[in-house]
Regions:
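Acidic, surface-exposed loops and disordered segments
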Residues: 1-186
Length: 186
């Protein structure tokens, strides 16, 4: 098996991170991998916001929990009410990925960038977790102000957030993969 396929096989969603920050070299390589993702018509309709400031991460975690509790969504309310719930798994780095709302394929392109981030991280020994739930961060007045303060451009909307950090423990086991989801037309 070649190195790329090995990285794909080993990548897991990590939900326990050590507190130490990833290196600048690792971060630069991971961000570069995002910028190299494919996009429809090479539009590159994305914006990446890298957050490592502990006070900002704490503020985002607090706001996410508050918005989940107010969401009216039974799953989110139950999850946010659980004292063991840690919104970003204590990851020391987050990459917020936003798409140009006018770009028809922006969400797909941002998803490709998120996968590049996760694979690059795994290849460097850095754990990652791609999350869509942080979108709820921006569904309040404080959330709109938060996006502004983070430098998210006007006309861009959250697609996903990638948590990054060193893994606090071994990779989780591979869950069983569905095998009846492929058909070939030859």
């Amino acid at each position: 098996v070649n190195e790329t396929l090995e990285v794909i096989r080993n990548r897991r969603s990590i939900r326990r991170f050590r507190p130490e920050q990833i290196t600048e070299h690792e971060l630069e390589a991971i961000v570069e991998s995002a910028l190299l993702a494919p996009s429809a018509m090479n539009a590159q309709p994305w914006h990446f916001t890298v957050i490592q400031d502990k006070r900002m991460l704490d503020r985002m975690a607090r706001l996410m929990r508050e918005n989940m509790l107010k969401s009216g969504n039974e799953f989110m309310v139950r999850r946010a009410s659980d004292p063991s719930f840690i919104p970003f798994y204590n990851a020391p780095t987050l990459i917020l990925i936003s798409a140009d709302v006018k770009d028809r394929f922006g969400q797909f392109d941002c998803a490709a960038a998120a996968q590049n981030i996760a694979l690059a991280a795994e290849s460097l020994g850095v754990g990652s977790c791609i999350m869509a739930m942080p979108a709820i961060l921006f569904e309040s007045e404080e959330g709109v102000e938060l996006a502004r303060s983070l430098g998210v451009p006007d006309g861009y909307a959250h697609v996903c957030t990638v948590a990054l950090g060193y893994k606090d423990g071994p990779n989780p086991q591979v869950p069983p993969r569905k095998r009846d989801v492929v058909n070939y037309v030859r």
